[in-house]
């Protein structure tokens, strides 16, 4: 090993010692080192040279025992600290003492792959270990023992900060976010948005890692100072700024003075840190939805970059990030517009609408005002008009109801006010008269319900116009005057997000279940979307469904969810329930993958039907599976008989007591492998049904028999006469078949009530209906064959029609075929 030093002068005028260090590594690493030379020189400010193998020197110097054969000489030249760290890194990749695999959440992939891999490079510079991405979610770390342990500890620290989702103190957080944002935008790539959504504590740690390199910190500070200088130049050059600005950028400057006290609640617009010339042609809008909803993940699939993103010295070629996200109330987290002539009116319109929406105004009102006044109108005028329209919309119900009640009073011919509390959406102009006594107000409280025109609301009334003194007046205290400020209307999304604040833990007791229960197969996507109001994929809904069946004794429970639902997405809530259920072996992910930005996913409903066919289980879903009815007879039978629908009442999972209808089996029998035959009823009358609905018994009108009140109707000859019900009871006993009670009562004439005075009088019995004609039988057969087209069902249909010559009810015949 050889080393030496020469004097070199640095850029700041001080002379620093340039160290030359030579050492050997195994000769088989020569090709690896040749390929890695540019990367090593980029990571460490050194000059790296591969000198050659020892055999070359042995031939000239004839010293065979100086070094072992098969090794090569390397030379590093640079500052002492840089040479030492580069040497440790090179020896680590050539002769590693330790190799480790460190896993991390896939949502953190942006840290190691994003910002043009700058954070990964700084981690290597800081620890001198070779850190590389083995796969998404896995890091490969190798090198000397101490560097590997340091790198692994640093990565684990990042993971802990990410999982804890910690925030910095309020006085430090804005500065860290701004500094991190400048750094990330300097190294822009397709992971930029995901990096901006990281917790602020993790951002601070990444900045400290990056700023260990003095050059990075100097660049950031220089860029920040350039920003300030550009701001001053732009303030002086107001004419040029207005020429290149848009109504959205003008809106920011005008609203700074109006909403200075609510800077955190209103979104702001930030200009990109470029040169003055670029600043006039490039505008950037950053929605603070990413800060207000920092806990919500962002889907990596929503970011697409047109072409590769490289570090460009030419500032004219500014990379543009297009964000394609699902429609939501907080769209377009980042929008970069290149050049003023490229801004379309549609983009301008969308930016304006989204800006006012984030301030809490209704989208309908915002679009109406912009359409009326035009999107080129002064932003403050747009804001004032939007506020006026919002107030009008909220005041319309009050004015309409007030005029309606006044018209009703005039129609009744009374001049007195109704003695109830009336809320009037106007401000009190004068103080309450001193003649009104408190007792008068108490008296009207009781008189309210007697008046049909009183409002149900107990809001205090306010009187605007003077009222004659001879009438009873109701005046609210002056301090309870109606407030002109209107809060934005409550939405279902807000209710759902508030419900998530209530903590819920999935706890399944470790106790034996019931062996006689069927396998439960849950359509995870259907359940999650149902609990999330069809807007959010609520993993809590899946957990609630699993907990419900677990408490009922089911232990064979399977939930199917597509694999892509594991990605971070603001519309997927409480994803930790998916991980918990997967660890318990209850959750199964259906395959999905992404190829060139396009998602390829298998149909998860097919997995539900396949498993139900193999296990005889019940599918929990609100889907009808119409597209699978014709797939196979077994699937059709599953769809008809083994789908269990559900509903959510908040966080309460509810199932119907009669899953197959009013006359079907009860829920417990439906879920049991061996249901109780005494309690199971078919949805239709059974095959041995002897009672037919009344309209099937009735003969033609011209053949109706004329009998007296107490005269029994003559039975048709040649047929057994049904036994008459016994008199002396208030109502007949219901038959044991699935026929409902009201059908059975139709067999008795409604004109003949059961009274104690008629105990011994025989009741009239219905006559038997005539047999079907051949044409009727043929029509029924054709109808049944349309319902059951299978060849094996034709013989059964013929047998049923032959065995029941009086039956004309298509539903009853269909039930017999199913039985």
UniProtKB/Swiss-Prot annotation:
One of its GO terms (cellular component) is nucleolus. Residues 80-164 form the KH-like domain. Residues 517-669 form the RNase NYN domain. It comes from the Eukaryota. Keywords: Cytoplasm, Hydrolase, Immunity, Innate immunity, Nuclease, Nucleus, RNA-binding. Residues 1-13, 673-689 have a biased composition (Polar residues). Its main location: cytoplasm. GO terms for biological process: innate immune response; negative regulation of cytokine production; negative regulation of proteasomal ubiquitin-dependent protein catabolic process; negative regulation of protein ubiquitination; negative regulation of viral genome replication; regulation of innate immune response. The keyword Cell membrane does not apply. It is found in: Cytoplasm, Cytosol; Nucleus; Nucleus, Nucleolus; Nucleus, PML body. Residues 772-819 are annotated as: CoCUN. Its EC number is 3.1.-.-. Residues 1-20, 226-247, 666-736 are annotated as: Disordered. One of its GO terms (molecular function) is mRNA binding. InterPro entries: KH_N4BP1_1st, KH_N4BP1_2nd, RNase_Zc3h12_NYN, UBA_N4BP1, UBA_N4BP1_C, ZC3H12/N4BP1_RNase_Reg. Disulfide bonds: none annotated. Residues 226-241 have a biased composition (Basic and acidic residues). Potent suppressor of cytokine production that acts as a regulator of innate immune signaling and inflammation. Acts as a key negative regulator of select cytokine and chemokine responses elicited by TRIF-independent Toll-like receptors (TLRs), thereby limiting inflammatory cytokine responses to minor insults. Has ribonuclease activity. Belongs to the N4BP1 family. This is NEDD4-binding protein 1.
């Amino acid at each position: 090993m050889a080393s030496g030093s020469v004097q070199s002068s640095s850029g700041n005028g001080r002379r620093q010692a340039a160290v030359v260090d030579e050492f050997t590594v195994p000769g088989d690493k020569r090709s690896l080192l040749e390929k890695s030379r540019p990367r090593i020189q980029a990571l460490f400010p050194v000059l790296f040279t591969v000198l050659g193998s020892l055999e070359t020197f042995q031939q000239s110097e004839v010293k065979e025992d100086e070094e072992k054969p098969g090794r090569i000489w390397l030379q590093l030249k640079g500052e002492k600290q840089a040479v030492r760290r580069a040497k440790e890194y090179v020896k680590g990749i050539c002769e590693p003492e330790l190799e480790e695999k460190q896993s991390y959440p896939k949502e953190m992939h942006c840290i190691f792959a994003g910002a043009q891999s700058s954070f990964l490079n700084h981690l290597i510079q800081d620890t001198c270990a070779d850190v590389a991405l083995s796969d998404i979610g896995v890091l490969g770390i190798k090198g000397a023992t101490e560097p590997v342990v340091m790198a692994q500890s640093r990565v684990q620290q990042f993971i802990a900060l990410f999982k804890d989702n910690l925030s910095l103190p309020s006085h430090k957080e804005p500065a860290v976010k701004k500094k991190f944002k400048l750094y990330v935008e300097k190294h822009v790539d397709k992971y930029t948005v995901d990096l901006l959504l990281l917790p602020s504590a993790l951002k601070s740690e990444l900045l400290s890692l990056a700023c260990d390199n003095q050059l990075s910190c100097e660049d950031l500070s220089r860029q920040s100072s350039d920003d300030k200088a550009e701001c001053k130049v732009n303030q002086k050059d107001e004419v040029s700024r207005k020429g290149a600005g848009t109504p959205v950028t003008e809106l920011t400057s005008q609203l700074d003075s109006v909403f200075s006290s609510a800077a955190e609640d209103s979104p702001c617009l930030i200009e990109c840190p470029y040169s003055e010339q670029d600043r006039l042609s490039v505008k950037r809008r950053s929605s603070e939805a990413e800060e207000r909803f920092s806990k919500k993940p962002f889907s990596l699939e929503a970011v697409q970059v047109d072409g590769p993103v490289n570090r460009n010295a030419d500032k004219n070629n500014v990379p543009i990030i297009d964000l394609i996200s699902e429609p939501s109330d907080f769209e377009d987290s980042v929008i970069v517009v290149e050049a003023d002539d490229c801004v379309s009116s549609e983009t301008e319109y969308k930016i304006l609408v989204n800006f006012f929406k984030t301030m809490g105004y209704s989208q309908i009102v915002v679009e109406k005002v912009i359409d009326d006044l035009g999107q080129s109108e002064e932003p403050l005028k747009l804001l004032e008009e939007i506020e006026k329209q919002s107030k009008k919309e909220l005041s319309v119900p009050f004015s309409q109801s007030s005029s309606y009640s006044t018209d009703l009073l005039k129609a009744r011919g009374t001049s007195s006010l109704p003695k109830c509390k009336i809320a009037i959406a106007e401000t009190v102009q004068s103080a309450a008269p001193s003649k009104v006594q408190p007792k008068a107000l108490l008296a009207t409280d009781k008189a309210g319900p007697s008046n049909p025109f009183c409002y149900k609301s107990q809001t205090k009334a306010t009187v605007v116009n003077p009222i004659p003194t001879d009438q009873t007046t109701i005046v609210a205290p002056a301090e309870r005057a109606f407030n002109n400020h209107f809060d934005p209307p409550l939405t279902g999304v807000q209710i759902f997000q508030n419900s998530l604040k209530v903590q819920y833990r999935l706890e399944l007791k470790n106790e034996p279940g019931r062996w006689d229960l069927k396998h439960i197969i849950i359509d995870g996507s259907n359940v999650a979307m149902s609990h999330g109001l069809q807007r959010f994929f609520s993993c809590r809904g899946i957990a609630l469904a699993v907990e419900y069946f677990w408490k009922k004794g089911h232990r064979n429970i399977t939930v199917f969810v597509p694999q892509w639902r594991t990605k971070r997405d603001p519309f997927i809530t409480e994803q930790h329930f998916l991980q918990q259920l997967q660890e318990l072996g209850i959750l199964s992910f259906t395959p999905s993958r992404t190829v060139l930005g396009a998602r390829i996913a298998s149909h998860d409903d097919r997995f539900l039907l396949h498993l139900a066919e193999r296990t005889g289980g019940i599918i929990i879903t609100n889907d009808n599976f119409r597209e699978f009815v014709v797939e196979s007879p077994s699937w059709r039978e599953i769809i008809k008989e083994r789908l269990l629908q559900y509903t959510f009442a908040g966080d309460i999972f509810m199932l119907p007591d009669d899953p197959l209808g009013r006359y079907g089996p009860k829920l417990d029998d439906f879920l049991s492998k061996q249901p109780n035959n005494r309690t199971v009823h078919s949805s239709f009358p059974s095959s041995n049904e002897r009672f037919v609905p009344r309209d099937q018994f009735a003969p033609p009108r011209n053949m109706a028999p004329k009998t007296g009140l107490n005269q029994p109707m003559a039975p048709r000859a040649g047929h057994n006469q049904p036994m008459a019900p016994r008199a002396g009871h208030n109502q007949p006993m219901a038959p044991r078949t699935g026929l409902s009670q009201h059908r059975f009562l139709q067999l008795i004439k409604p004109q003949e009530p059961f009274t104690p005075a008629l105990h011994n009088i025989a009741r009239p019995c219905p006559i038997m209906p005539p047999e079907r004609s051949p044409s009727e039988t043929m029509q029924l057969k054709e109808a049944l064959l349309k319902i059951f087209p299978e060849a094996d069902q034709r013989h059964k249909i013929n047998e049923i029609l032959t065995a029941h010559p009086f039956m004309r009810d298509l539903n009853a015949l269909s039930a017999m075929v199913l039985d």
